[in-house]
Curated annotation (Swiss-Prot):
GO terms for cellular component: helical viral capsid; host cell; host cell nucleus; ribonucleoprotein complex; viral nucleocapsid. Pfam families: Flu_NP (PF00506). Late in virus-infected cells, may be cleaved from a 56-kDa protein to a 53-kDa protein by a cellular caspase. This cleavage might be a marker for the onset of apoptosis in infected cells or have a specific function in virus host interaction. A motif (Unconventional nuclear localization signal) lies at residues 1-18. This is Nucleoprotein. Its main location: virion. Homomultimerizes to form the nucleocapsid. May bind host exportin-1/XPO1. Binds to viral genomic RNA. Protein-RNA contacts are mediated by a combination of electrostatic interactions between positively charged residues and the phosphate backbone and planar interactions between aromatic side chains and bases. Keywords: Capsid protein, Helical capsid protein, Host nucleus, Host-virus interaction, Ribonucleoprotein, RNA-binding, Viral nucleoprotein, Viral penetration into host nucleus, Virion, Virus entry into host cell. One of its GO terms (biological process) is viral penetration into host nucleus. Residues 8-21 have a biased composition (Basic and acidic residues). It comes from the Viruses. Residues 1-21 are annotated as: Disordered. InterPro entries: Flu_NP.
Length: 498
């Protein structure tokens, strides 16, 4: 990928590291995982959870959320300055599920944030360990990406629901740092920028004064993050114009929407990381596994091996299908919400079906849901093969971006040729080519139109047997490419914004 040399690798983003070699990166990522695991073990002790209850993904989510809330400084400050009825700004908590008399019971727990911070720091050798917090945020974000299709949010910002494959990381908090920025899709960045520009249009003081200066710096930083995701000179030049605009307004919004559309074909580079729930790391650490000593990577075989040997349970509502619940969580663990279903199915070794055909709602249980009818079951998170996670958008042809798949953003570096109907796609670009960026727009359209079929194929490595830890013998699966295997299309997934 172009200019990859100037960027830090994932794991460096993950650990805020200076330049490190592969071994150091594996060790520091391992250290982060150890910290999450130790924290989880300690929380299970505090909450007196049995082994089974500690492996329940709903309990894991509550515990993760508690520590994220305890460290959310901006929100904590806000809560202290704007006290609201019934909310103690110094406390955090949530539902914990326990098995009592052969039934699942919900218990609401409340802890001092200070106490949670103490337990977290203690598990992380006294550090704040922000990398570990970000890791949990990305896991929650991947779970949201898999569970909800953000049609409404897209429509609100004037984008098209067909762009949902660009929306990775759309629920990540702003404070998720470099590692968070790396996993955000082009559409997510465009949406954040459009929201900002709209505020500026409606509030004339938004760009003014001391606060306005900070706003402006944030705007330019977001523009640069988005620019870094594009792989063609024309797209980047257009981002420079958006960034340098004196007074961002509707023209910039138009340009951003155009760029988002172009990203359906000229794919941006978006990182993919396998972030697992804390209830996977906890038992592994408890069993004596030393992640720091052994080393760990979020983009290689390690998460696959870990899931191969983990037992995770989930509460199941009366009319839900446990196999479908497993697929939802498997996709979240592998950051595969926007991957081609055929590729995912091949790697998983069982058919992965579209969101609309899944008989399952989200993983979290609302506080008003009846617990009497809740069952629990084992989540099947194992895979048949493993593959390297990609960050290129799948175009490795000599520094020049080529066309990608429309309704997916590749997660796995697996070779495939693409069903690619240029006419359908180019239809999205008829119309508005005037304005300051008309020449750039024309250039971007030209690049898309001239993408040759052989450039349209995705040059990936292939998949590997789980025994092939060094990725020595790639298996290149052949797919029936008559149609695209999109997870979200032709269906009615729940909305995140409900």
């Amino acid at each position: 990928m172009a200019s990859q040399g100037t960027k830090r690798s994932y794991e460096q983003m993950e650990t805020d590291g200076e330049r490190q070699n592969a071994t150091e990166i594996r060790a520091s990522v391992g250290k982060m995982i150890d910290g999450i695991g130790r924290f989880y073990i300690q929380m299970c002790t505090e909450l007196k959870l049995s082994d089974y209850e500690g492996r329940l993904i709903q309990n894991s989510l509550t515990i993760e959320r508690m520590v994220l809330s305890a460290f959310d400084e901006r929100r904590n400050k806000y809560l202290e300055e704007h006290p609201s009825a019934g909310k103690d700004p110094k406390k955090t908590g949530g539902p914990i599920y326990k098995r009592v008399d052969r039934k699942w019971m919900r218990e609401l727990v409340l802890y001092d944030k200070e106490e949670i911070r103490r337990i977290w720091r203690q598990a992380n050798n006294g550090d704040d360990a922000t990398a570990g917090l970000t890791h949990m945020m990305i896991w929650h974000s991947n779970l949201n990406d898999t569970t909800y299709q953000r049609t409404r949010a897209l429509v609100r910002t004037g984008m098209d629901p067909r762009m949902c494959s660009l929306m990775q990381g759309s629920t990540l908090p702003r404070r998720s740092g470099a590692a968070g920025a790396a996993v955000k899709g082009v559409g997510t960045m465009v949406m954040e920028l459009i929201r900002m520009i709209k505020r500026g249009i409606n509030d004339r003081n938004f760009w003014r004064g001391e606060n306005g200066r900070k706003t402006r710096i944030a705007y330019e930083r977001m523009c640069n993050i988005l620019k870094g995701k594009f792989q063609t000179a024309a797209q980047r030049a257009m981002m420079d114009q958006v960034r340098e605009s004196r007074n961002p307004g509707n023209a910039e919004i138009e340009d951003l929407i155009f760029l988002a559309r172009s990203a359906l074909i000229l794919r941006g580079s978006v990182a993919h990381k396998s972030c697992l729930p804390a209830c996977v790391y906890g038992p592994a650490v408890a069993s004596g596994y030393d992640f720091e000593k052994e080393g760990y990577s979020l983009v290689g075989i390690d998460p696959f091996k870990l899931l191969q040997n983990s037992q995770v349970y989930s509460l199941i509502r009366p009319n839900e299908n446990p196999a479908h619940k497993s697929q939802l969580v498997w996709m979240a663990c592998n950051s595969a919400a926007f991957e081609d279903l055929r590729v995912s199915s091949f790697i998983r070794g069982t058919k992965v079906i579209p969101r609309g055909k899944l008989s399952t709602r989200g993983v979290q249980i609302a506080s008003n849901e009846n617990m009497d009818t809740m069952e629990s079951s084992t989540l099947e998170l194992r895979s048949r093969y493993w593959a390297i996670r990609t960050r290129s958008g799948g175009n490795t042809n000599q520094q020049r971006a080529s066309a990608g798949q429309i309704s997916i953003q590749p997660t796995f570096s697996v070779q495939r040729n693409l069903p690619f109907d240029k006419t359908t796609i180019m239809a999205a670009f008829t119309g508005n080519a005037e304005g300051r960026t008309s020449d750039m727009r024309a250039e971007i359209i030209r690049v898309m139109e001239s993408a040759k079929p052989e450039e349209v194929s995705f040059q990936g490595r292939g998949v590997f047997e789980l025994s092939d830890e060094k990725a020595a013998n790639p298996i290149v699966p052949s797919f029936d490419m008559s149609n695209e295997g999109s997870y979200f299309f032709g269906d009615n997934a729940e909305e995140y914004d409900n």
